[in-house]
Amino acid sequence: MFNYYRKEIEWGGRPLVLETGKIARQADGAVVVTYGDTVVLCTAVGARSVKPGQDFFPLTVNYQEKAFAAGKIPGGFFKREGRPSEIEVLNSRLIDRPIRPLFPENFRNEVQVVATVLSHDLENDPAIAALIGCSAALTLSGIPFFGPVAACRVGYADGAYILNPTLPEMKESALDLVVAGTSEGVLMVESEASELSEDVMLGAVTFGHEAFQAVIDAIISLAEHAAKAPWDLAEPSAEEIALKQRIDTLGRAAIAEAYQERVKQQRYKKVGAAKEAVLAALATEGLDVTAAKPILKDLEADVVRSAVLDTGYRIDGRDLKTVRPIVSEVGILPRAHGSALFTRGETQALVVATLGTAQDEQVIDALEGEYRTNFMLHYNFPPYSVGECGRMGSPGRREIGHGKLAWRAIHPLLPGKDTFPYTMRIVSEITESNGSSSMATVCGTSLALMDAGVPLKRPVAGIAMGLIKEDRGFAVLSDILGDEDHLGDMDFKVAGTESGITALQMDIKITSITPEIMKIALGQARDGRLHILGEMSKALTEGRSDVSSTAPKITTISVPKEKIRDVIGQGGKVIREIVEYSGAKIDINDDGTIMIAASSEDQATRAIERIRGIVAEPELGAIYTGKVVKTADFGAFVNFLGARDGLVHISELAQGRVAKTTDVVNQGDVVKVKVLGFDDRGKVKLSMRVVDQQTGADITESVGERPGRPAR
């Protein structure tokens, strides 16, 4: 019944198993990947025909995590998986980026790749297993695919690289790097690092590329037994070849002339006009205008790429290494806690920092368990930033991915909660875009956080590198434009400080690049990053000495652990009363640390005094101001130290004989009392008789102590 095949290898100290032929047999390709006890089902399905008028490659990658994989039931009212989580979106992109360049250039059939996490052992990352499985599924499917591709995760600790570190090991690693590629070279890199050098980062990429060669061999071995017959790819017809030559004759010179314009919007108009002229000419000649559009795109790319390689100059007139002009401004929004406007050429980011309390932390429900984060970065790319009309709404995959890249760049430089107990939210609004908006977000975020008074260890900057590679040579471009990104072969983003790299993301549009090119790009990126940091320093070089006057002021105090219950009170009654009385927000940790967030010093003082009053122990002989909370025949109960009450015996109410308690005090009276001692149950014995009720002075010597009662 099953045409089952299995391939197992030892990889990174545990078995990696690839299986096919038992599950999802109606998909073009289906592979179950098991790594440790993490299991991922990966499928690939392709449409056999192209939709009419299709002029792009419709590849969709969906990575999905099932709650049952970790023995959990989804939360919420419906108790089932809903919209993709952030990690699902990020891992979908992680799989998409290395496989997309490996389809034939003119392939337009719809392809859908799905990775479903079926089991998660809470040690082995399902994203790596998913990427390997999707590559294997495509390799087996018969869909035109120039793979296989494989991937691994690389850590770095104690001067050594770690292959596929477990989730607990990642907590001790100075590097979290994912590298993917073919047997020939690297296709994709994604990383977060603790200010590591270019040599260490390049070494990690090389280490990873060598490490996953065994996986590529395993996929090939599985394909030798289980692969389906490859699809036939139609060769270009004589008519298509003739059409391409005709378009080249009609359009090359006009498009090259249009690209002499250095202002983006004007250039787009001229290039668009040149293309329309070519299409109009083809229509009058009776040629296929629909088929001509993708050929025109290829011609446009060839014109731009050839100009860079032939002249060493780019669309906007810069040489290969020059960074566009930079203007940095901070404190531009009066009520924001921190703000910055970072402009680099025709790319601009308005970045705003908001400070909150522990109550504002984001709670993330992941397969690994629920955890909290006090740093959020949200990247928005409205259509007006490129002069277009478009959809406005929830963030798309690209916005989530760009925001996470900037988050990785900044995260290693943030202060610890013990020194800066704030929750930080960053919003980056891209107000203009002509390439490298995610790196503008990194620069703007660094400035906005420092403007908000966040003590960053060092400022962070980012730069996007590009590549033009042909048989006759290559050129590495610094600070690429949008057109250079679209028409080039590489988008290589590098962020870091003057001390080292904190984030790196590389996407390749060709089959691979060499270590030589990566080394040149990293060196050129370092020069560009240091230049950008110098320009940013003209606005701000370090965090302001204090947070904004509009931000909450957080004060941290500690109380004994055994006193936490007293501060909270039964059912939270006491803490609610303190919040209502002071107007401050209060967070209590299990270790006895209490964080008080207040909009004014008075609010903080009121909350601190009330808490200290609750946890303080009465001092023998000390005098306190209190309030009578209850009267009885034998005396009065006085609340004198936070929530603590004590008894003033009727004999200690006044100097003379007192016949009735209410002759001296009534409920609600404010009185001054002295601590005389404690009974055998710890109850406090108080006296009003030995305290001057006007001045609060101790008058024991003048009135004398009350003699004790004779023994019965």
From Swiss-Prot:
Catalysed conversion reaction: RNA(n+1) + phosphate = RNA(n) + a ribonucleoside 5'-diphosphate
Domain KH: residue ranges: 552-611
UniProt xrefs under Pfam families: KH_1, PNPase, RNase_PH, RNase_PH_C, S1
Keyword Lyase annotated: no
InterPro entries reported for this sequence: ExoRNase_PH_dom1 (IPR001247), ExoRNase_PH_dom2 (IPR015847), ExoRNase_PH_dom2_sf (IPR036345), KH_dom (IPR004087), KH_dom_type_1 (IPR004088), KH_dom_type_1_sf (IPR036612), NA-bd_OB-fold (IPR012340), PNPase (IPR012162)
Family, per entry: Belongs to the polyribonucleotide nucleotidyltransferase family.
Protein name (Swiss-Prot/TrEMBL): Polyribonucleotide nucleotidyltransferase
Species the sequence originates in: Gluconacetobacter diazotrophicus (strain ATCC 49037 / DSM 5601 / CCUG 37298 / CIP 103539 / LMG 7603 / PAl5)
Gene (name only): pnp
